[in-house]
């Protein structure tokens, strides 16, 4: 009579097959419950660099106060219906150097000094620390963001390589006798900022002030800013303009680099772009479709001209500051607040954290359950042939 020895392992395997699916189901239920517990037990805590963020916000508030006084001294009244918080940092609806339409609510939102805390946080997320090089492209449409960026760089001890364009959209820095670079000079004279612009263009169409109705006024502004010692950029061709700017960025960065060695794009920790001047995306549609916040380099090359695609294609992240109605709430700041929050306050300084001890405990439980599940799965047995 022939003995089939493989029948006994098959009986054991049946019992194992019955237990394994149950354990596997328990494992996945445990994971789902763990995720729920971890999410339910998160707690609110200050960000590790909250004090640096507060330093930037408080300095920005001091800058705004000085600029308000200087604006009034120069004869530009504040319109309460446009600037209900009476910050003095909201321009007029239209002037001789207004380049395009802008959102009044967005401009008002940036008068909150805590925007500097947000920018500091974004810089930290890009890895910026003391002594790092940061390329900066500023329009004059959001003067508050510009000042906040300078204060954020100062608070971190970073080195900004900064170029500004003078033209501004509605309610931006569009006061002909008090443009953004006049604001910078005021702050420099008061010793309130360390980082500042070293070059400028007129902005607007073709980035040369084309379309501004009073070209004599444009020339007056140009001459005034040249008197501050800033280098002037004037290129109608976008490719020439971009090449000249990149040469300036890399050349100026080389002067700031303590190693005194050639500088490449990778030596910049990030690019900050505030506003929507033509050099951001080379006048393409990317300016409209790109999300605000941190843009990370992708696997595929970015299409189009402009500083943002160029830096991304060099592997350098970009902090894009433009669409305030989404960017501010995403970072814990209110949109168009009345009254303004005090500097150093708000959700922007906090983050939600998981409880480490609970994470470790639940992870250990998951590993144990996974091990038990693996043990209950049947192993393959060699086929045993019985003999008579």
Indicate where each model-derived feature is located:
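A substrate-binding/cap region within the structured catalytic cores of diverse enzymes
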Residues: 178-267, 271
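N-terminal Lys/Arg-rich, disordered targeting/topogenic segments
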Residues: 1-14, 388
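Hydrophobic membrane-insertion alpha-helices, especially the h-region
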Residues: 20-39, 365-369
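Solvent-exposed loop/turn segments at secondary-structure junctions
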Residues: 140-144, 167-171, 204-207, 277-280, ...
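C-terminal functional extensions of proteins
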Residues: 265-266, 270, 277, 284-388
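N-terminal, Lys/Arg-enriched amphipathic/low-complexity engagement segments
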Residues: 52-112
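Membrane-embedded segments
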Residues: 114, 121-126, 130-179
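Membrane-interface motif at the C-terminal end of an N-terminal transmembrane signal
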Residues: 31-47, 373-380
């Amino acid at each position: 009579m022939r003995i089939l020895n493989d029948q006994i392992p098959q009986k054991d395997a049946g019992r194992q097959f019955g237990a394994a699916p149950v354990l596997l189901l328990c494992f996945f239920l445990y994971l789902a419950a763990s995720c729920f517990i971890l999410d339910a037990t998160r707690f609110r805590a200050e960000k590790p660099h909250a004090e640096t963020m507060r330093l930037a916000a408080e300095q920005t508030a001091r800058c705004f106060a000085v600029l308000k006084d200087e604006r009034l001294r120069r004869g530009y009244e504040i319109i309460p219906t446009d600037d209900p918080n009476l910050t003095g940092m909201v321009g007029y609806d239209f002037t001789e150097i207004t380049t395009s339409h802008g959102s009044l609510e967005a401009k008002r939102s940036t008068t909150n000094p805590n925007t500097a805390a947000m920018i500091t946080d974004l810089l930290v997320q890009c890895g910026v620390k003391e002594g790092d090089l940061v390329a900066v492209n500023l329009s004059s449409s959001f003067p508050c963001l510009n000042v906040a960026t300078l204060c954020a760089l100062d608070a971190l001890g970073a080195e900004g390589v900064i170029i500004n364009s003078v033209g501004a959209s509605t309610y931006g820095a569009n006061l002909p006798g008090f443009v953004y670079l006049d604001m910078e000079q005021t702050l420099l004279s008061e010793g309130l900022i360390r980082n500042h612009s070293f070059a400028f263009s007129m902005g607007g169409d073709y980035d040369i002030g084309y379309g501004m109705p009073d070209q004599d006024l444009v020339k007056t502004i140009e001459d005034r800013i040249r008197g501050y010692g800033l280098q002037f950029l004037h290129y109608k061709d976008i490719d020439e303009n971009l090449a000249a700017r990149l040469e300036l960025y890399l050349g100026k960065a080389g002067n700031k680099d303590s190693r005194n060695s050639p500088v490449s794009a990778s030596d910049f920790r990030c690019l900050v772009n505030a506003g929507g001047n033509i050099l951001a995306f080379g006048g393409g549609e990317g300016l409209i479709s790109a999300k605000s916040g941190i843009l990370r380099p992708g696997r595929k090359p970015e299409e189009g001209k402009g500083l943002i695609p160029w830096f991304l294609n060099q592997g350098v992240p970009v902090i894009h500051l433009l669409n305030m109605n989404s960017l501010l709430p995403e970072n814990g700041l209110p949109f168009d607040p009345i009254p303004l929050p005090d500097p150093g306050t708000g959700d922007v300084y906090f983050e939600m954290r998981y409880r480490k001890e609970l994470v470790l405990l639940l992870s250990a439980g998951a590993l144990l359950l996974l091990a038990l599940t693996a043990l209950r799965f049947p192993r393959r047995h060699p086929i045993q042939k019985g003999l008579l």
